[in-house]
Amino acid sequence: MRDHCRVRVLMVLCCLMAAGVTVRAGMAQDKPEIRKDGDAKTLNAAPPGDSITEGSVTVGGQAIAYQAVAGTLTVGSTDVQDAMIGLDGKYLADAGIDLPAKPEDQPAITRMFYTAYFKKGANSADRPITFLYNGGPGSATMFLHMGAFGPKRIVTPDGQHQVAAPYPLVDNQYCLLDASDLVFIDAPGTGFSRVLGKDAGKAFWGTDQDAHAFDRFIRRFLTKYNRWNSAKFIFGESYGTTRSAVLSRMIEGVDLNGVVLLSQILNFDDSADGPEGNPGTDQPYFLALPSMAATAWYHHKVPNQPAQLEPFLQEVEQFSLGDYASALLQGADLPQDRKKAIAEKLESYTGLPAAYWIKADLRVSGGDFSKELQAEEGLTTGRLDTRYEGPDIDPLSKEAEYDPFTNSITAAYVTAINEYAREDLHYGENQTYKPSARQPGFHWDLAHVPPGGQGWESSVNVMPDLALAMKRNPKMKVMLMGGYFDVGTLFFGATYEMKHLPMPESLQSNISYHWFHTGHMVYVNEESLKELHEYTSAFIRENAGTH
């Protein structure tokens, strides 16, 4: 069973992989306060220098002058090694390190790329700071940076495939600098981040290794920029929410003010990706049904189509946790007449024929659904955003072979970050920006030591991590957001996870929820981006603790 769990989690991880006034480039006149360490010894190749530029963005009618710093921080693979590395990316002179001659034999490090935006003229003690990252695992943070909260954003057609270049890169009136200074972080091996040294991938590519790297990065950043006394927030999307749960528990000496989770997955046993590989676990099926029903509603596949989505979903959710879950839990003991009645109800919610549901034993995965919903039209329905659709690749396959949404928007974001980083931030000369760390030799270590350290988990479930962080820091607030049209990270599954966190009921009041009529990346729809900005900026202001 453990092998089945690991295979299934690998499938889920593979599926998850998937700026008002123009920034004025130029050397800034008032650099942010930066600490510097003393003499040091070079660690591997010297890291690229920081690039400091300045600009202005208009949000809510107010011009915000800012300074942008694009650079890297060097992080060690263990706490002991990390403590020997200075802020300049070199070993401290008194560390007594004798490095092997060959870089590939030297201790593993990662140089984590970041872009930080600081509001000019603001008192850092009164200015919150938010650390943002996408997921994957192994994905760069170009999506949140160029699609949601940076000073520039890429515009892609909502619900349809983006045409080829040139792509419109516009001033972002929804930039989050109105509420907080921002730090966009590329995970080890992604973007301009690099992993170097002996067994570097093994040292940083894994559930716990990754969280440790972000922990060390954030503490280094707080030291370098003298921001230890600022209100602190983390914002993770997709697998970034998994990272945030572990990070919020793991980070040393930091009480976070708030955690924002966008398109959440904390327990991979709840995923609709490949649940057939974990028989006996029926949660993915009844947690996915509301997302499937929402998708069918969007594509007008629901018999007797309801006029409004939310009341329809409330009915589906009640059925999911009631009759549907009960039927699944009976397994082979479910009477045939009862199975037929459940299948007919499922047809009324999803448009998939009752006969199909019966053939599937009432259990349809996300990939099955994406393939079947519009099969008669020769179309595959999107996974991360089910409003999108594309031509079938293999009409005879059981599951969707690709995600039309991911295919629709990725090229635009890769283009945007490359142009913006090189032309506006003046960073990345002679370097390749890696949208993903996935390459020959990439392997993600699924092992996770849960709170208490009672052995290693074979499947990823970080609900205990977030619960422990909230118990240790009962003033920390959590905001959960997501889209209805997403079968990759289920909105109903995210709520289910939150309602089942192992913590006192009183702490449930620290969690707030917001859902959008979009998919995984809610910000591809401008109206949803506007709401996303409003919710996030309000959350930061309410929990920053500044006066």
Language-model regions: role of each:
Residues 331-488:
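Alpha/beta-hydrolase fold catalytic core
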Residues 151-155, 248-349:
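A catalytic-pocket lid/entrance helix-loop region that shapes and gates access to the active site
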Residues 226-238:
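Alpha/beta-hydrolase fold nucleophile elbow
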Residues 517-528:
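Catalytic histidine-centered segment of alpha/beta-hydrolase-like enzymes
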Residues 247, 476, 490-500:
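Short alpha-helix in the alpha/beta-hydrolase fold that links the catalytic acid
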Residues 235-248:
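Glycine-rich nucleophile elbow surrounding the catalytic serine of serine-hydrolase chemistry
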Residues 176-180, 187, 204-223:
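Alpha/beta-hydrolase active-site loop
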Residues 30-39, 80-203, 499:
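N-terminal cap/lid subdomain of alpha/beta-hydrolase-fold enzymes
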